[in-house]
Amino acid sequence: MKKERKQTPYIELSKVNKFFGITKALEQIDFQIFSGEVIGLVGPNGAGKSTMMKILTGVLPPTDGKIIVDGTEMKRYTTKEAKEAGIACAYQDLSLCTNLSVYENFAMLNVEHGMFTKPGWRKTAKKETKELLEKYFPNNQIDIMKPVERLTLAERQIVEICKTLMTDNLRVLILDEPTSALSTDKANQLHKVVEELSARGTSVIYISHKLEEILKISDRIVMMRNGKNSGECDPKEIDTVQLVEMLGGSGAAKGKQKINRENAAKGDMAVSVKNYTGKGLYNINLHVHKGEIVGISGLAG
């Protein structure tokens, strides 16, 4: 169900540019997120999604443009200001200390560190870690005593997400490819967490190449391409095929490009698919010759 928006967005980027030398990573980006809104952020690799998230979390300063938080333009905006605004990110490349145990990673955030730490802090940290993991990902079977480096990638992803959810004043949660290693069951548990956060007024920016997931969970979809806004849409009004087309994927289906196969053809035709349309596929043409190595790439979905 579409959420009613307040007049003022909680976070707004206005005409934001980001340059790395002469390379233009972001160009005239306008981005708004309202309280309780779930935004699906999509685009190919290199579109500028991660750069924009680093600006939102204060890790990178914009070259120019405005960052507005709760109606106030920020004259200074670093990780400190982002944290005070309640913005937290569960990173795709993970921010965990791999040499520490699971509970020690959590303890780094919720235990007062000093010369005279309270007695029994380890026992408390272990209990809180177990409770937190079970709250968001029931039956996760994660051994909190294990060093993070010995966990599976899926377990690390769960720990990263739960650690981010510990943020006391959480107002905006950024999830960067959060289900890339998760099973369907664990992904569904995360979707439930996102729904609960949204109902409480916490905004979520959900970055994923899994387009069916984006359509399922988002209130609004924002698209990026080549460092620019390339449009937005209502997920209730489109399907996966239409979203792929909006992202620029239709060119491959509609274009009647001629490919010179003289160099590629190392032998006789091994597989040939012509104008195939089926479930989730549209007008597929594929020709593979014996001895040929064919790379296939694209967005999930």
Model-derived features: where do they sit?
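Glycine-rich phosphate-binding loops of nucleotide-dependent enzymes
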Residues: K2-G301
